[in-house]
């Protein structure tokens, strides 16, 4: 190619580049004008066929034309990149003065909140939090807790038994097995709180649910008495329900404690009234339970107690239907979640 034809090819490339509207078009035009099949690259490849005395000038003409086209391509590319960046910024621009709809933030479930509040109270007393499996051996759920073989709590009407029949595995009916496991694996003294899910064959209604949460406490040490139990429950009740709260005990029977009692709580409720409400069970650990875990009841005594989290939440907050706690309706959970 002559110098004139090379300049014409470079001018055509420059004119084409100027007409590109975006980077994709520019890339396509570069392939057309500076790709392998374009005039200037072809002229460069043919330099070897030109007589030696003309090759130097021909090479200079080719390089000048190619350099001019490449330089202009680079300039146009910079302009189009700036244009693209400006368009992207405009699309992504946020007007911070425009009012927005506040996003709803998730929060903990009220049962979880209450569980953590109770755990914090016990930790503040120097107690430890202990947990255990939900699928439990009958030995830990019943035998070691002094339940007789024919106790009604063992039946299918009260307990979920795990297949196959005869496996002696159940869904735990209380968190007391955690106490047994702890006493077997730890040296006394022991002060533990045992939160967790438990399972019973109750129908779901306003006051019952087949899956619910318990918090149980166990203390085993030298010289513990019912007075220590009463003081612990008084402190827990005042922390949960307020400084005006009172507790009382009524004699009862449980296989794993002796003597045993029901504990009631009195406190001003959210509706402006006050009254005694049954809260949970408690008592001194039965000597048979201590012997079953290798603790000498002549040297050590212990007390234990337990209450339902759902029931506590229900009467503390004036809730009429326990089903609201398990059905997942955000209208129920949102007011509690604000506290989280």
Swiss-Prot record:
Signal peptide location: none
| Pfam short name (any one) | Phe_tRNA-synt_N
Q: Which residues bind Mg(2+)?
A: 258
NCBIfam families, alphabetically?
pheS
Q: Which residues form a coiled coil?
A: none
Say which family it is in: Belongs to the class-II aminoacyl-tRNA synthetase family. Phe-tRNA synthetase alpha subunit type 1 subfamily.
Q: Name one GO cellular component term.
A: cytoplasm
What's this protein's name?
Phenylalanine--tRNA ligase alpha subunit
Q: What is an example of a GO molecular function annotated in this UniProt entry?
A: magnesium ion binding
Q: Does the keyword Cytoplasm apply?
A: yes
Could you list this entry's UniProt keywords, alphabetically sorted. Aminoacyl-tRNA synthetase, ATP-binding, Cytoplasm, Ligase, Magnesium, Metal-binding, Nucleotide-binding, Protein biosynthesis
Query: Catalyses which reaction?
Result: tRNA(Phe) + L-phenylalanine + ATP = L-phenylalanyl-tRNA(Phe) + AMP + diphosphate + H(+)
